[in-house]
From Swiss-Prot:
Keywords: Chemotaxis, Hydrolase. InterPro entries: CheD-like_sf (IPR038592), Chemorcpt_Glu_NH3ase_CheD (IPR005659), Cytotoxic_necrot_fac-like_cat (IPR011324). One of its GO terms (biological process) is chemotaxis. Residues 165-184 are annotated as: Disordered. Belongs to the CheD family. Pfam families: CheD (PF03975). This is Probable chemoreceptor glutamine deamidase CheD.
Amino acid sequence: MMLEAAGRRVHVIQGEFKVVNDPDVVLSTILGSCVAACMRDPVSGVGGMNHFLLPGSSTSPASAGDATRYGVHLMELLINGLLKQGARRDRLEAKIFGGAKTIARFSNVGEQNAAFARQFLLDEGIRVVGESTGGEHGRKLEYWPVTGRARQYALTGVEAQRAIHQDQRPAPAPKPVESSIEFF
């Protein structure tokens, strides 16, 4: 059994994205029906993760609400964050996780989330190098953005209920924008 050096863990919750270039950082999240897209530029050594609740679309009126819940918004934020840190779009690669159907009697929003992520990445010309989506159980995900390594654990029983609860928590309220403009 190989022991891993302890790295700095950064948790990505629903409605967030993180971009890092530190090889000692591992990004982690817990997914039920939500999806996390993990992207990186293997040459520049920068990578990141997002965590979205609903697919959304640029033409959907629902997306005009709390944008941080929607994949269309968080995918753009993640890509732009990577580019700002020196990644090149033509070198980006992605892995997709989550999208479980955790509650049988509800519509399969997890499947819709995963399908959205696949189509978005295809439309953007970003290569998908790994995917683990669907199923009936949540996942705990760890992603090392600099190397692209990912590890997941299936959540069953109590862990699955915790993942469902995590997915149903509201996203954090957006921070107010600071401005030096005074309106009167």
